[in-house]
Amino acid sequence: MPVVMARDLEETASSSEDEDLANQEDHPCIMWTGGCRRIPVLVFHAEAILTKDNNIRVIGERYHLSYKIVRTDSRLVRSILTAHGFHEVHPSSTDYNLMWTGSHLKPFLLRTLSEAQKVNHFPRSYELTRKDRLYKNIIRMQHTHGFKAFHILPQTFLLPAEYAEFCNSYSKDRGPWIVKPVASSRGRGVYLINNPNQISLEENILVSRYINNPLLIDDFKFDVRLYVLVTSYDPLVIYLYEEGLARFATVRYDQGSKNIRNQFMHLTNYSVNKKSGDYVSCDDPEVEDYGNKWSMSAMLRYLKQEGKDTTALMAHVEDLIIKTIISAELAIATACKTFVPHRSSCFELYGFDVLIDNTLKPWLLEVNLSPSLACDAPLDLKIKASMISDMFTVVGFVCQDPAQRTSNRSIYPSFESSRRNPFQKPQRTRPLSASDAEMKNLVASAREKVPGKLGGSVLGLSMEEIKVLRRVKEENDRRGGFIRIFPTSETWEIYGSYLEHKTSMNYMLATRLFQDRGNPRRSLLTGRARVSTEGAPELKVESMNSKAKLHAALYERKLLSLEVRKRRRRSGRLRAMRPKYPVIAQPAEMNIKTETESEEEEEVGLDNDDEEQEASQEESAGSLGENQAKYTPSLTVIVENSPRDNAMKVAEWTNKGEPCCKIEAQEPESKFNLMQILQDNGNLSKVQARLAFSAYLQHVQIRLTKDSGGQTLSPSWAAKEDEQMELVVRFLKRASSNLQHSLRMVLPSRRLALLERRRILAHQLGDFIGVYNKETEQMAEKKSKKKLEEEEEDGVNAESFQEFIRQASEAELEEVLTFYTQKNKSASVFLGTHSKSSKNSSSYSDSGAKGDHPETIQEVKIKQPKQQQATEIHADKLSRFTTSSGKEAKLVYTNCSSFCSPAAVLLQRLPSSHLSSVITTSALSAGPGHHASLSQIPPAVPSLPHQPALLLSPVPDNAPPSIHSGTQNVSPAGLPRCRSGSYTIGPFSSFQSAAHIYSQKLSRPSSAKAAGSCHPHKHHSGIAKTQKEGEDVSLNRRYNQSLVTAELQRLAEKQAARQYSPASHISLLTQQVTNLNLASSVINRSSASTPPTLRPVISPSGPTWSIQPDLHASETHSSPPGSRSLQTGGFAWEGEVENNAYSKTTGVVPQHKYHPTAGSYQLHFALQQLEQQKLQSRQLLDQSRARHQAIFGSQTLPNSSLWTMNNGPGCRISSATTGGQKPNTLPQKVVAPPNSSTLVSKPASNHKQVLRKPASQRASKGSSAEGQLNGLQSSLNPAAFMPITNSTGSLEAPQVIFARSKPLPTQSGALATVIGQRKSKSVKSGTI
């Protein structure tokens, strides 16, 4: 904010300023520091380079923070600074907060720095980064403290000065040597020799003994790039970043001298190996152990799995780093004291290259002044962006406008200067200076606290020492992914004596931070320091302290990607969980506990949120997100539970800055290590395995969602994404067929844009997960009801498992699921087998046994045979019913056991005026393993657009039931086989139930466990029984579950006791339906009686289609006389009824294979025309009818269509087609529900004769079928059953039977009652 505004607001102490400060205190990019917590320091977030969040930029823009980059080009640094509101200034400008340079700094430039300005190099840092100076410093330390204490470099000689010594050493050991220029990088000028004559002495070079026993991974040599941050040389403060890079050679290692010139084998520099044709790059940031560049944590995890002691290895690495920096500490600290006006002005990031031999001893290769920050792979970006962001946070950029330079004034300003600093918190009454206030606070708190605590003895410290002590502690609070390796209580005892820069700051820092260590530990550390001074002993695991083990666990954990943190920030969970870097609320509270105890609590805690990689679409954290609310478990618990991979997550901070004594009193909380439990003969229950699989699928859905935008659409990326989406599509196709519940698959077409396909696929995967979770819950409820105690014993602790699922990453879940699958030798528990397989305990009965609501209409997928896939027709709208590959068709059914009478209860609740016509086509299968399909229907007609709303939404109380007809398929035997796909869910009997009642002697159902079958054994007879039960319920207007169950069981036992003949219940039915001439009748009657909003269209998909017309349109539409007459009575064709009943009874099988004729195609084309002309006048429809009658006049159609229509609101239309031959005799009867119409063929001109004919035929009908019905017919009053045959038993002209919905007292009087009712109402049949 402007300076004037800051002054005015401070003087007036306005409420707006207080609100602004309150907002800043809560800002995720602000941490308040200083004695009174009035100095804002910027906190960096690596994910900001992806989110472009204005909330992150606003702080930098408000304070006009700026930077300049000199003699280098780092896109990563520029991107991170720009994302946080920094703006770049000219390299010659002096108004900047950060100067990032790629070269050493001149002394005059350092002298001009203000305390708020920072540069990324120390003066004389070449003492470390030049190979000759590093060698000289190490040699000096070896001479001073012993060769073994600083034996961190291979044997080295500086040529040409030490050429004679080199030749002398070579004569003793003629192994290979490596030559390096003293001031080069990236492997330039490096080569191997095996003879001194091969060396050129024209320039200064370094010759080192080649380490010919390197540690190999898969026979490849590698080294490790470590990132070391030094924030001060006086006192010396060293941080090591928890993540690094393992760089591999591209040629397998061979010690033979013939390969000595092969740089791709012996050099591991990325700049060298990237030129190799064998270089492999990994494009997935989540995969860290693939290709020629691994993460250091992945390398450590691999070594740990191989049985290597990674704790000792990393302890050796820390030892090497500390000794290396100490060797140059004197020269650099002296230069800083001479040239740098402020202790906090400089910082430096070093790149340590370390080679590990096969004894796990690390060797220092070189130290890089400006380690490469190029991001050539996603893994580079993840590691380096996190590291740079954490480094900037540790360094601490004060939010101060660089134009308001205070020169050499203290950052803790006087009263006058504070009025000009906008970042300073206002205070109404202030002492002489902020520093004095800090001192008084410290002294006052020291007097109040118990002696022996840290804050109790600040007396005697100078102002400068107090500020240094506070700054070091605040840096440690902001360290993020950096680990302070010096000073710590252990490293100070070991390496303190090596420091050569004898100032009071190092000693003060150590004594104030670690003064109250316990006597036993102090004696142990003193002994270690003494032995180390005498001979630099080998570091062993037995002597490792707790902090070393914790550090090893930190190095092994996996760093979270930027995308993960981006999703968390987007969901707002980062601020909701905790402030990023909690600060002690009052300065006095830092006196409660010693720095040593505080550090232990901060570093020992477990970071639970590090493992939250995508438990839902937003559940992941970034590397900065590692610093969540902390816990303080004991060391033994942490070490015992540290996983092989990266489950160990260590916290960095105390919880919300609360006093450490409160945290100390908390109970230790151990980390739940699921993989360890599984490896120790533990196991998951089936429900737990499904929960883990569901969480894994949610991670996959997150990846699909997050990548749907913001990507560079390169061909390689598009090909990769297409391949991954294809895997998900194949999974959904296979897995959805195993679901017991319905699932509508709308898989995206490959013609769509890539990002649109990802969006649709992510949505479909989400739907699948929802249904999958429902089934898992039902499984859990079912097991809990049955009290399966063995399942509980097999599973792990439920609460711990839920916590693991919530926090686990995708990689961890994948590892657990893979191990579980291998252990149980099956993955069927995740998806099960075919839930609708042909078993008696199929999902038809299972789904209804769960107590689901009977009003829920669901969708079932039927897997089609492979021979039919080629002919399956796929339109865009057709995908609502079938998957994009055509392997699955769908069928709507009520969610009850075996389609039983709960559906009738639904219809009882519906008003009679809203009941749609209910009629179904019998399509029972005549052979095992054959499914319904209408794939032979031509693809000319589009499917109806209103389908999804019907299929997905539950049926309301005032909505009529849907009739869903099945499909047919040609069997290998050449017979038209049909599976029942049409079920009447109403209280009135349907065509199928009537056929069953009048035949009674049906053939054995033939769906016996055929490959790909999705129907139970007793599916067909069970359907008829269900219809029967439904009628009973409708008659009594009540639903009795026990009565229905008993009746179903009784009928099933009677049916099973009969002798069945194979394939006799379908043959003549299919023959008769195919011989009906529907060309004129369907067109005529649909045009005459059907309102435009209800006229049907045949879908090329062939399963079932239903539409829900506009209620207003259907209610207000004026119906023609024929339509009104249809509302008063039901129609059915006599000949078809007789044919179908006879075919069920006799079981005559047709002898020729069904082949659709041209007439059937023309019929469907006519129906398509009707759909397209539904809003036109009746005159146009009559013309269309006449045209098609002329076409089909001389042809016999092999298909017939049964149309169910109703003019009432909310009615639904269903259709089915079947094919077959014309039978000889046609004993059959049908009953149509009220307010329904069956339009099959053109009726005869004399309707009264049609009505009288069934009465005379009834006497000649065989009594065997009726005798079996006498016990049940009395309960079926709502419908009239009228068998119709002619004298010859063959089909004559199509006839119509009218069945009333009013209950009839007896079956014998049904016909007379119907005729009497129609006469009394004077209903004219007319042309329909």
Curated annotation (Swiss-Prot):
Protein name: Tubulin polyglutamylase TTLL5
Localization annotation: Cell projection, Cilium; Cytoplasm, Cytoskeleton, Cilium basal body; Nucleus; Cytoplasm
E.C. designation(s): 6.3.2.-
Species this protein is from: Mus musculus
Taxonomic lineage: Eukaryota, Metazoa, Chordata, Craniata, Vertebrata
Keywords: ATP-binding, Cell projection, Cilium, Cytoplasm, Cytoskeleton, Ligase, Magnesium, Metal-binding, Microtubule, Nucleotide-binding, Nucleus, Transcription
Required cofactor(s): Mg(2+)
UniProt keyword annotation of Ligase present: yes
Binding site for ATP: 180, 186-187, 208-211, 221-223, 268-269
Ligand binding (a protein): 186
UniProt-annotated binding residues for L-glutamate: 247, 270-271, 293, 384
Site positions (Essential for specifying initiation versus elongation step of the polyglutamylase activity): 186
Residues where Mg(2+) 1 binds: 353, 366
Family statement drawn from the similarity comment of this UniProt entry: Belongs to the tubulin--tyrosine ligase family.
Compositionally skewed regions (Polar residues) per UniProt: 420-432, 1116-1128, 1214-1227, 1234-1248, 1257-1271
Catalyses which reaction(s): L-glutamyl-[protein] + L-glutamate + ATP = gamma-L-glutamyl-L-glutamyl-[protein] + ADP + phosphate + H(+); (L-glutamyl)(n)-gamma-L-glutamyl-L-glutamyl-[protein] + L-glutamate + ATP = (L-glutamyl)(n+1)-gamma-L-glutamyl-L-glutamyl-[protein] + ADP + phosphate + H(+)
Domain TTL: 62-407
One record GO biological process: sperm axoneme assembly
Top-level EC class as recorded in UniProt: ligase
Disulfide bonds: none
c-MTBD region: annotated span: 378-488
Subunit structure of this chain's protein: Interacts with the transcriptional coactivators NCOA1/SRC-1 and NCOA2/TIF2.
